[in-house]
């Protein structure tokens, strides 16, 4: 049994480890040494150059800018273009549970932890993933009282997975959907469950052991399956975080052991309605969906397995907000959540039915008073009197390190925690507001797009289905909540900035023509994003593959481009990895991150701690931006320092890396320049 440490003992250990010599820790870490650019990141002068991880001997690659105002080519590494591709709702263990890396590399997943065997059956250490039943009546419980472990998991449910595939034929799909390789369109015409929605999923065994569930044993990889709950307070409860349970290898005390219980007790929320009569563990339409995982060892996710073995994979990249799609895309774009404001940009009070209340309704076990996509999604997290707030704030205060900005909650601000529509339509028209609209007003908060524009670094957001702002392409499957800049008044009321929102065919054209901006964020439509129930992972693989092959077909572009492939969040699936609480909002579970470039080859697995805002930090470091998005944005956090024997847990928490560890620039060479000239300290 792990030794339990209180806050003072853990803090003393971390300080002592740092005092023994950061240089010693750095030299001992061969796979993930700490980045040494903390001084540079703290508003260093332009002329000062500090070491960036990924270059030999702490050296920095400089590229002289082109003449003119565009500073897009002034980079500190050979990377002049970065493309971020964002899928939907898969944890790291859900995808890479049984992945075995190339020789000399190590990965932390269900297989390496002994939780499952390569054939998907429970492994010798399956007890690490044991799930519990619990009791939560009255006030919201962050770590509810355990009652008993499950003897068997609740049965699987079909939920919203389609009975039939969305298209009758590959030809019909290809006539509407441009985002797949030609050979992949049959996937849109196959894989329906053959069962009604919200019934027992008889494709799975009726009796399931208390363990992660191998989907490959029951389904084909091309089959549709249900989606688990992925909302803010629900995910906090699923992780079951208690500072009293903190250990040296788990500073958060999160036990990750209430996934099915939260699914079956509250699911996606009450929307303010009473608990249904005759309530069972199937009423929420989920069962134990959260415990499902794909099996790469048996051929699932073949393209993502190939990319991992060829390029670089992170096994310590996290969703940045507990909960769902909208809030995590917002965090990527703003480095912090956004709040409900008035026309002047000041915090205001939202309609009462849109304020979260995760307390249990009287007479129920964890059925929330007010929460849901048609219910509560705002919280004034600086006010301990707000339901659910004190429990999280007290937990953060009890941790062996200080939360970012004390939790990063502005006074009197109601922050959006889940999915609401953005404040603008694609054509720049303000979206309708009101108690029944579930739309957040336009925000004046600063964001990555504005930062890049101020520094004259080119950018675009390519959202499939944009259709020149009509948002109706590909059968109306454009994801409006995924575009962080649709929430921004400064972007959407400026025609030049608004025009940088484009479509998938614009991305293809820019790749072919060599007109790609420095920073690109690309989002598939709802058909291809890999979201469980409404999509499949093989469809997202196809979306990624088409873009990767197009970039590689342009040798000039491939020479200086990095393609980063990740997800918006874990979707509520179980994951065994460490989670670092940064502030009130997260982090959440691990999600996959692949970095594809000629400087990321070799099948390396990188263990540095990252989340979505690490992308912002990469952009700022690569383009030498001596400014952060805002004073409260997470790109102000330092890069992690960790012990070589446990690179997953930052000693200087809270800390997130800048993704430079995903690259090896030692082979960088520009024709016509000596290496000694290119590499400077």
Regions from the language model: what does each represent?
Residues 29-681:
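N-terminal pro-sequences and low-complexity stem/linker regions of secreted or lumenal proteins
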């Amino acid at each position: 049994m792990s030794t339990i440490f209180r806050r003072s003992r853990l803090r003393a250990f971390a300080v002592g480890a740092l005092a023994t010599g950061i240089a010693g820790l750095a030299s001992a870490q061969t796979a993930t040494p700490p980045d040494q650019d903390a001084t540079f990141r703290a508003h260093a002068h332009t002329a000062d150059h500090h070491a960036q991880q990924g270059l030999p001997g702490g050296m920095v690659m400089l590229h002289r800018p082109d003449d003119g105002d565009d500073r897009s080519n002034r980079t500190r590494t050979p990377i002049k273009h970065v493309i971020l591709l964002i899928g939907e709702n898969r944890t790291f263990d859900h995808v890479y549970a049984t992945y075995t890396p190339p020789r000399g590399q190590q990965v932390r997943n269900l297989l390496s932890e002994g939780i499952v065997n390569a054939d998907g059956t429970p492994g010798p250490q399956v007890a690490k993933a044991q799930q519990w039943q619990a009791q939560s009546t009255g006030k919201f419980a962050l770590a509810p009282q355990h009652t008993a472990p499950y003897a068997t998991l609740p049965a699987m449910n079909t939920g919203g997975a389609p009975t039939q595939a969305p298209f009758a034929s590959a030809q019909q799909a290809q006539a509407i959907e441009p985002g797949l390789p030609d050979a992949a369109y049959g996937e849109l015409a196959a894989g329906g469950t053959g069962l009604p929605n919200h019934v027992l999923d008889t494709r799975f065994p009726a009796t399931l052991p208390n363990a992660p569930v191998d989907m490959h044993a029951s389904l084909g990889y091309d089959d549709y399956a249900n989606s688990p709950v992925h909302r803010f307070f629900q995910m906090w409860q699923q992780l079951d975080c208690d500072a009293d349970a903190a250990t040296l290898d788990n500073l958060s005390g999160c036990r990750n052991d209430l996934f099915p219980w939260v699914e079956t007790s509250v699911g996606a929320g009450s929307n303010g309605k009473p608990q249904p009569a005759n309530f069972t563990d199937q009423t929420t339409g989920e069962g134990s969906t959260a415990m499902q995982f794909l099996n790469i060892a048996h051929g699932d996710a073949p393209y993502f397995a190939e990319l991992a073995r060829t390029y670089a994979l992170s096994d310590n990249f996290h969703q940045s907000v507990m909960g769902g799609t909208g809030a995590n895309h917002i965090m990527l774009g703003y480095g912090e959540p956004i709040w409900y404001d008035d026309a002047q940009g000041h915090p205001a009070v939202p309609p009462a039915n849109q304020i979260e209340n995760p307390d249990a309704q009287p007479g129920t076990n964890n059925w929330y008073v007010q929460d849901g996509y048609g219910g509560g999604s705002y919280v004034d997290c600086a006010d301990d009197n707000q339901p659910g707030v004190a429990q999280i704030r007290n937990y953060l205060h009890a941790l062996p390190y200080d939360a970012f900005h004390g939790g990063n909650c502005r006074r009197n601000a109601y922050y959006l925690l889940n999915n609401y529509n953005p404040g603008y339509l694609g054509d720049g028209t303000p979206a309708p507001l009101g108690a029944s609209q579930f739309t957040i007003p336009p925000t004046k908060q600063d964001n990555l797009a504005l930062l890049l524009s101020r520094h004259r670094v080119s950018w675009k957001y390519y959202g499939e289905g944009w259709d020149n702002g009509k948002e109706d392409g590909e059968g109306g499957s454009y994801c409006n909540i995924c575009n962080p800049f649709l929430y921004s008044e400064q972007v959407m009321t400026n025609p030049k900035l608004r025009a940088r929102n484009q479509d998938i065919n614009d991305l293809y054209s820019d790749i072919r023509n060599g007109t790609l901006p420095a920073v690109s964020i690309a989002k598939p439509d709802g058909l291809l994003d890999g979201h469980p129930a409404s999509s499949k992972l093989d469809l997202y693989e196809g979306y990624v593959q088409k873009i990767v092959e197009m970039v590689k077909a342009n040798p000039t572009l491939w020479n200086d481009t990095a393609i980063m492939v990740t997800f918006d969040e874990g979707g509520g699936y179980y994951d065994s990895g460490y989670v670092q609480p940064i502030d009130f909002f997260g982090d959440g579970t691990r999600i996959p991150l692949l970095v594809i470039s000629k400087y990321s080859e070799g099948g390396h697995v990188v263990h540095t701690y990252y989340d979505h805002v690490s992308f912002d930090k990469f952009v700022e470091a690569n383009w030498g931006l001596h400014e952060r998005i805002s004073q409260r944005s997470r790109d102000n956090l330092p890069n992690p320092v960790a012990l070589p024997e446990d690179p997953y847990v930052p000693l200087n928490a809270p800390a997130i890396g800048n993704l430079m560890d995903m690259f090896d620039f030692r082979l960088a060479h520009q024709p016509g320049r000596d290496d000694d000239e290119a590499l400077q300290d």
